[in-house]
Amino acid sequence: MIQVETRLNVADNSGAKLVECIKVIGGSKRRYAGIGDIIVVAVKEALPTSVIKKGTVEKAVIVRVSKEYRRPDGTYIRFDDNACVIVDDNKNPKGKRIFGPVARELRDHDFMKIVSLAPEVL
């Protein structure tokens, strides 16, 4: 459950390390975002040599949330942190590598490139 002002780790090598959610995409009254949802983020920490600089505004997809998520088969999944991957307008990741596990629900939201780059899909 990600809302405005939530800080997330970045799970790719785009150069950003920490971002803050500034908008949940999908309606003016939408408050929360979950796994597979696109949010607008502001970069709070970035590597000095990266293309993405501190203070820039990007779009990102959520790949891990620490709040447990109930799947249709009745099982629950929960991660240790909140993490996202910075994407472009065509749902392709800006980085070339993904760090850490990602949720299987990304496959249902058509983020196949992220799923194929991830070292583990849970």
UniProtKB/Swiss-Prot annotation:
An example molecular function term from Gene Ontology annotations: large ribosomal subunit rRNA binding
Gene3D superfamilies: Ribosomal protein L14
SMART domains given in the database record: Ribosomal_L14 (SM01374)
GO cellular component: cytosolic large ribosomal subunit
GO terms (BP aspect): translation
CDD domains, per database record: Ribosomal_uL14 (cd00337)
Alphabetized PROSITE patterns for the sequence: RIBOSOMAL_L14
Phosphoprotein as UniProt keyword: no
Assembly notes: Part of the 50S ribosomal subunit. Forms a cluster with proteins L3 and L19. In the 70S ribosome, L14 and L19 interact and together make contacts with the 16S rRNA in bridges B5 and B8.
Main function: Binds to 23S rRNA. Forms part of two intersubunit bridges in the 70S ribosome.
PANTHER family cross-referenced by the UniProt entry: 50S/60S RIBOSOMAL PROTEIN L14/L23 (PTHR11761), LARGE RIBOSOMAL SUBUNIT PROTEIN UL14M (PTHR11761:SF3)
Protein name according to UniProt: Large ribosomal subunit protein uL14
Provenance organism: Treponema denticola (strain ATCC 35405 / DSM 14222 / CIP 103919 / JCM 8153 / KCTC 15104)
